[in-house]
Amino acid sequence: DEDSQGIPFVGRAGQMLTRMIENVIEIPRSEVYICNVLKCRPPKNRNPEPSEIDCCEPYLHKQIEIINPRIIVALGKFAAQFLFATDTPIGKLRGKFGRYRGITTLATYHPAYLLRNSSQKRVVMDDLLKIKAVLDGAEPEIEVLC
């Protein structure tokens, strides 16, 4: 779906993400800018090579510069590891705040992972409540130093 429409998160995982944004954070998805670290899908949906991520980095930086978000949410392993400049597993990064280019950033599981592991939905809901609290004015506890 994402490839044919050229828009991230429009398939089943995207529909789940929309419900979570609107029901937990309580803002319309239309007020959330969603982009991918990698700007195209690797062949056969394989994991991206570091060189592929490096090629896309300037585009991501420009997107973030233009949008100037209050908070960034890193969905999944590759986004979290890239934004936090670490190879720490997503299970250890999930639910933790850091800063990317001075912007408060939180890592959580990717919605596609939740489609395969529904038992993890509760922890992601907890992460989204942390995001809501920060958007409502709470100070995040920065735990990941990047």
Tell me the role of every PLM-derived stretch.
Residues D1-C146:
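A polyanion-binding, active-site-adjacent surface
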